[in-house]
Amino acid sequence: MMISEKPLGVEESIRQDLEVLTVSRRLVKSVSQKLKKKIHKTEVVEDEEIARGAVNCLSISVGCRVADTGEDFEDSSNKRWSSASEEGKGLMTICGTEETRLDCFSYGVRERFWKKNNRKYLADSGQDYRKHVYLPDDILEMCLMRLPLTSLLNAHLVCKKWQSMANTQRFLQMRREGSFQTPWLFLFAALKDGCSSGDIHGYDVSQDKWHRIETDLLKGRFMYSVTSIHEEIYIVGGRSMDRNSFKSHRGILVFSPSIKAWRKIASMRHARSLPIVGATEVTSEFSTMQTKQNRQDRRFHLSRVGGESDVYEDPHRLSVRRQNRNSADQNGTKSHRLIRQKLDRLNRNSSKRFVLIAIGGTGLFDEPLDSGEIYDSATNTWSEMQRLPMGFGVVSCGIICNGIFYAYSENDKLSGYDIERGFWITIQTSPIPPRVHEFYPKLVSCNHRLFMLSVSWCDEGDGQIGRRNKAVRKLWELDLVYLTWTEVSVHPDAPMDWNATYVSDQNILMGIEMFKIFGQVLSFFTVCDVLTEEASWRHVSRNQRSQKLNLSCTNKTIALLHL
């Protein structure tokens, strides 16, 4: 009996212990749930306080809560309570020497204090802060807008965002209107080792520094002409070596130096080498179809003078001609309507409309051309223009001035093409500036004035010994009202380069001369201000590009842009 009662007592004690243990688990679970609710409520309150911003403890009328550093930073026995708490009523908590080490915070700043002293959190937040440091787009755009061209091109390499921002039409327009651009001179068709290298040499006038732009599109291509408008350079025509023969080009290449981009536009109707080219802006009412009709009507009336009447000709030929004429008029009307519709649609999308003119040059078989073509940027098409006047001769130079394309021939004749009305005008000038025929003259338009540079022998009676052995380059101006030439100035350098090229920038004339002497290629860059009374020339740059060129650039050409 004693043996059986002992196990029963043991089992009873074990069951009681289990019941106590069960109660303890329930108590723990209940306490845990209450603790979670309290923590969640505290976090919500802290978030609300942070959203409202930190409140200065001195501005609270009911007192402040002293920060409880908690078990993370101090021992729990050193916990401090503010005068506003229930446990601290009647106690002075901000006096006494032992309270000097305790800081007073706004309620809900304990988490901030912990973040401030946690090294790992500071390291992570510092990295995140550095990742999100950036300038607003408008301020970044203003900074990029004021950079010089070389620095702006380097900024393109920073990221895709900067590159896309600096290539938009809005950015280029704001840069242009803000007068942040500087003049750049681009030299084409430089010869090296007996052939065209294809490189483009850009000269920053403001910095007096040359830059080389490598490209494979112009390698081996020569005898082309260039012109510039709207921050772009147009390379027109030219030739290249095709195995054992020469190939003439009709295509047009467009180079944008500000973004280092190339593109193509519609090709000319005829292949041309060394054509005389020019570009100018036109109004939205300009139409190449209208100028073509005006030329046909003008030719038609001129051809009928002194001729027979249509009534007395062969009736069959008369009917066929009238039928062809009516069909041509109908086709012309339809094509004109289509072009006008396309023109109106493109004018809404385009900013500024311009035309590109190419006249003269040599054809496929080196024959001189007296025809011309005009390109309309709105329709991206070329159309024939009226031929040069009879007996005009081979065109040697040309320039656009005040809406007139002036062309000068090897026979010392001057003609002007009215771009808006579409016909040539023969201009009789006096006296004709004397010149040495081995040196071609150059027409330049500067500040709505027409100039010509030509090489002539020294005048008699100037005291020079052997005057027939000395040639000078003179600058002449044409009076557009009285059509008379007047000598303006004399270039200080001897005319060693027979293909010296000149461009203008407002009232400044710029010229580049390159020639080979004693086995060395020399280059000179000179400028002239035509607004001054003396109109004197001065040297700007010497022998900077000629060091890497071993041949004189007989076919060189230049273009000026503001970038």
From Swiss-Prot:
Where along the sequence do coiled-coil regions lie? none
| Keyword rRNA-binding in annotation | no
Spell out the SUPFAM superfamilies in the cross-references. Answer: F-box domain, Kelch motif
* Gene3D superfamilies assigned to the protein according to its UniProt record, in alphabetical order: 1.20.1280.50, Kelch-type beta propeller (2.120.10.80)
Q: Which domain of life is it from?
A: Eukaryota
Protein name in UniProt: F-box/kelch-repeat protein At5g42350
Q: Where is the F-box domain?
A: 129-175
**Upper lineage:** Eukaryota, Viridiplantae, Streptophyta, Embryophyta, Tracheophyta
Signal peptide residues on this chain, from the entry's feature table: none
Give the UniProt record's GO annotations in the biological process aspect: regulation of cell growth; regulation of cell size
Q: One cellular component GO annotation, for this chain's record?
A: SCF ubiquitin ligase complex
- The Kelch repeat ranges on this chain: 184-231, 232-282, 355-402
> What keywords would UniProt list here?
Kelch repeat, Repeat
